[in-house]
């Protein structure tokens, strides 16, 4: 359960924080509204099932495209945040991200999840039961597969600090734009 919470925290850092900011900075209110519409459609109908195949596939591919850059930025921001979180490993976060991100079934979720796995010395994803069916996903990261409460606390610290770093970078960019 803790491992799943850490995976969700990493993926949602990209989907719920960085991607909306990215699209807002790129296209303003239209960008964030468009992104949230695509992301919500993917959540609602972007499933691999007969029922949603026709429309769901389009929603899923649009979401993949919209998250391509934000997911990679998210991984880098989590690795940067790891430099300031006790016992976190920023270089391992980067190495794990480069090595393992493509192992994830999603073309984007692997980037922040791999960065989180490396930073915390955990193995995320891996074999699991999903709706009663065993899913044999590969492991992301080479650390412990069993996450503990201190790991979740450090994951939360990484999440919060990465949000602060992202906000700081936006402020710096805005100041530079206003001075230009």
Residue ranges and their predicted role:
Residues 1-41, 46-180:
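Hydrophobic alpha-helical transmembrane segments
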